[in-house]
Amino acid sequence: MKRYGKLLKQTFRIITTLLVITLVGCSAIVTGDGADKKEIVLDTAGTENTPDIETAEKIEETETEEKPGRVIALSKSNAELWLLAGGSLIATSEDALGLEGVDEDTADLGDMDHVSLEAIAALEPDLLILFSTDPAQKALGEAAEGIGIPVYYTNIDNYADYESVMTDLTKLTGRTDLYETRVADVSEEIEEIIKEVPEGAEEKTYLLLHVSATKSKVEKNDYFASEIFNRLGLRNIAADDSAFDELSLEQIVASDPDYIFVVTRGDEKKALESFDELFKDQPAWESLSAVKNENYYLLSKDLFGLKPNDRWAESYREAFKILYGG
């Protein structure tokens, strides 16, 4: 059998045109250098997520060849995606070391944004999984492809992106059966939860804040958790409001959302101390409708801060309980 990296190079060389996707979410496999450098963009946006025929044929072909067996995924989310697809890892970043399927034989590459090309190359991977939106990982990916290491980029902003990425990865591992249990079944559960939203319920507004020890920011509709609350009948009051680009208590008071949701980043204790000092401890905070009606919630970081992957339905269920009980 041909090795996976060689197969990718041969496949990319015979493709005469690049698929160009202008939709928001996408992932890609990149390999080669110089004149051989090719990037195949895999659609992860839109309502149907119908794969490009050329891309589908390429992935189908890999199923008859040797599957990637020396895979490195940087970040807990990317590592989990590959493991959920039935793959195994030879190395990952330190934040993923606690995942089921990562054992003592899995090399620890440290901080996901400070991994050297030398450390990657020394392990001789046949697939590297990275974020397309992380500048440090994008730079590492470009360097890796330059020495012939195949790179698969992920960018998951919503559930449709998760579906599309898992389609690709389960085809690469040959475990399309896992797509059924970890994507199709999850999709059905999500739809059942959405059906439980009361008909004719008054549309209420919300503000979703990401807070850390050094900064607080408002999440707009391109954040995955915003999609969850939107589909459950709420409206993001900051969706198209540039006034929220710089968060202030005055702007929150002026918009007066029905719900305020907070997700922490980094050290939770320090993040909340900073948030309390800047917002909650101010007299104007008590004037907010969300506060008066006890609709201020600190959300689970695992379900609303990190990409939930196969726990998307759990995130929906938790959000539903907050909004409608049950």
What residue ranges belong to the model's regions?
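Extracytoplasmic ligand-binding site segments that recognize negatively charged/polar headgroups
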Residues: 137-139, 155-168, 207-224, 268-270
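Proline-aspartate-enriched helix->loop->beta-strand connector
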Residues: 117-130, 149, 249-262
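Bacterial lipoprotein signal-peptidase II cleavage site
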Residues: 26-48
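A short, structured surface patch at a secondary-structure boundary
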Residues: 72-123, 127-134
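Basic- and aromatic-lined ligand-binding clefts that recognize polyanionic substrates
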Residues: 68-85, 178-232
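Structured C-terminal subdomain patch of bacterial secreted/periplasmic proteins
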Residues: 161-180, 184, 264-326
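Alpha-helical, coiled-coil/dimerization segments enriched in small aliphatic residues
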Residues: 95-99, 217-244
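Sec-dependent N-terminal signal peptides of Gram-positive bacterial secreted proteins and lipoproteins
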Residues: 2-33
